[in-house]
Amino acid sequence: MIQQKVLFISLVAVTLGLGLGLGLKESVQPQAQSWSCSKLRCGEKRIANVLCSCSDDCLEKKDCCTDYKSICKGETSWLKDKCASSGATQCPAGFEQSPLILFSMDGFRAGYLENWDSLMPNINKLKTCGTHAKYMRAVYPTKTFVNHYTIATGLYPESHGIIDNNIYDVNLNLNFSLSSSTARNPAWWGGQPIWHTATYQGLKAATYFWPGSEVKINGSYPTIFKNYNKSIPFEARVTEVLKWLDLPKAKRPDFLTLYIEEPDTTGHKYGPVSGEIIKALQMADRTLGMLMEGLKQRNLHNCVNLILLADHGMEEISCDRLEYMANYFNNVDFFMYEGPAPRIRSKNVPKDFYTFDSEGIVKNLTCRKPKQYFKAYLSKDLPKRLHYANNIRIDKVNLMVDQQWMAVRDKKFTRCKGGTHGYDNEFKSMQAIFLAHGPGFNEKNEVTSFENIEVYNLMCDLLKLKPAPNNGTHGSLNHLLKNPFYTPSPAKEQSSPLSCPFGPVPSPDVSGCKCSSITELEKVNQRLNLNNQAKTESEAHNLPYGRPQVLQNHSKYCLLHQAKYISAYSQDILMPLWSSYTIYRSTSTSVPPSASDCLRLDVRIPAAQSQTCSNYQPDLTITPGFLYPPNFNSSNFEQYDALITSNIVPMFKGFTRLWNYFHTTLIPKYARERNGLNVISGPIFDYNYDGHFDSYDTIKQHVNNTKIPIPTHYFVVLTSCENQINTPLNCLGPLKVLSFILPHRPDNSESCADTSPENLWVEERIQIHTARVRDVELLTGLNFYSGLKQPLPETLQLKTFLPIFVNPVN
């Protein structure tokens, strides 16, 4: 980072020096000067074909240059004004509701502003005076059309259909690209963009370029829109947006978009670390300054709500960092979308679309070399945090490429200089800016990062609209707003727990279970017979933030209380929906006992509703795993509380390597680092990979010869106190969360780990599969943190937080 900063400072000096020498200052360029006033132009006679006027009647004619008042009338510029106070909100007559401007600067990575805000005085003032996030997370793939349309709809790409800048749809038998006329076919564009939400509810919307806005989606366009033309100067775009705000009330738009291609165009050509990027950033900054000056000239600078954001970031690339498919296949006989987010499909479509050997391609790209700069996935196996599987347009073969690398067909590929984007949205280089200013937003406010799927709901709130269904979590950005329009309501539990009373000891012959080390079976079983006081104490210890609520209809389950853990045992799937426990910094672990050595039926569960040990035969690839690790108990005798069939779940033998190391090594490590953890874990069933829990009818279709359904994933939610002086049980302030959705697969080929020790790969693997608590909720039908006393919007912030583990390359 220090080297980067030194390089940039040098580039700044060179750039500014060249600027002075080569006449880059606007005051020297007649064309640039025509967009602004000067003392010489003040009071000028009207001239034909001038881009804006500095004549004495320009205010009356509404064609003044945006800086007319500051240059010709001696008023202070917006840039030199102090930040508006909370009492300074003002709108001129005729503006009963604040207009909303959504301004996108393409490819403006958050790191540009983090490091070089002093070079961008207008953007820096917006950041200082308004609300800003350290960064906004783009959706995957981090491409232009994908993210702009997600911002407009609040939908993941798999939901709105624009899954990349280049797409093939087998049902339409059409190809989509940015330059093709087919991109204007409404069949590509799903969801309800914000301009339609506005017009459907009586407002007017105007778009000066936005992907999708020139398409007749659902039979209509925005009230006003412009067909894309990249040759139109940025100043002309700003001028037109300001003219829209000058329209009579009956015609004036309430929602407006503005888009500029910089710094993306320059980033692609020269890369994100270059003197040219500095010029592009300063050009973008001047464009914002022109807009704010124009708003102030209309007394709208404290009336309009403005959101300034980007679609994605930018990463440096090199022709020395390419992975060639020709090095993995003798004959590259398939179609490949090349670059930082590659996909592979059949060349012969639609004929071979469904019969293409996607699994064979992934297998041939997995663990082929000691060091590969990509991982190959079937779309259904991609990290759930990406939400990139549930659409026929998403090809089944996907490559997740390392930072600064690209995967391509062969050496004919030449677009490998400068910069690009499209990578994993957790990479720091892909992070985008988010700034907001206006009477609707809090002042001088920095907020934690969030995902761009949340912006649609935020815009609806500012415009007092009811959002269309979307993937955002409504209310999670209320802390950005001065007076939140929407108040979220707590989820309502759909299925309450049943009773599973302590019963007689069943015959061991029923289960096939054995445990020769138990000499006093009745005494061991009586430990499961907790009285009400003991249950209350267990809940205080093991469920400090409330019991996970079941939002699935007609779910039959009961709560099982033990001293050191609590579980919700499902009679539908014959395993726990969840298990919850709390461990401390000092919790010690030992080698977990083998279930085949000691396991017995839970006397609280009728035999007909219980798993049996005979379900697990030695020749099967499935083995019983524990949700609550028995070795977390403090004595061998207490371990018997967990060596019961109600605590086991079916796991592939290969997966138990990851699961056991996670629980015996990593969870205790995290507990030491965070002064204790509350742990909730359980199974996930998502066979149709739509990101939502499967119905029980669907689950039953995937019962194999073990007679129990096999989960597609397992989740783990680790919660601690943000103030690590406190343990999870005495935490009065904000909470901190780490959550994971781990694919349940028969092998560990994702990590090329069949022979590697667990300490070399398990932690990296689980970090790849980090997730939001909200993702876990959607996949399980559970509602977490129901017992928190804090306002619900604060809980929603916690649920939508995504941990980041990726170390930046630059």
Curated annotation (Swiss-Prot):
One of its GO terms (molecular function) is metal ion binding. One of its GO terms (biological process) is nucleoside triphosphate catabolic process. The active site is at residue 144. It is found in: Secreted. The keyword Cell cycle does not apply. One of its GO terms (cellular component) is extracellular region. The keyword Metal-binding applies. It is an enzyme of class 3 (hydrolase). Its cofactor is a divalent metal cation. Keywords: Disulfide bond, Glycoprotein, Hemostasis impairing toxin, Hydrolase, Metal-binding, Platelet aggregation inhibiting toxin, Secreted, Signal, Toxin. Residues 1-23 form the signal peptide. A divalent metal cation 2 binds at residues 106, 144, 311-312. It catalyses: ADP + H2O = AMP + phosphate + H(+). Its EC number is 3.6.1.-. Residues 33-77 form the SMB domain. This is Venom phosphodiesterase 2. It comes from Crotalus adamanteus. The lineage of its organism: Eukaryota, Metazoa, Chordata, Craniata, Vertebrata.
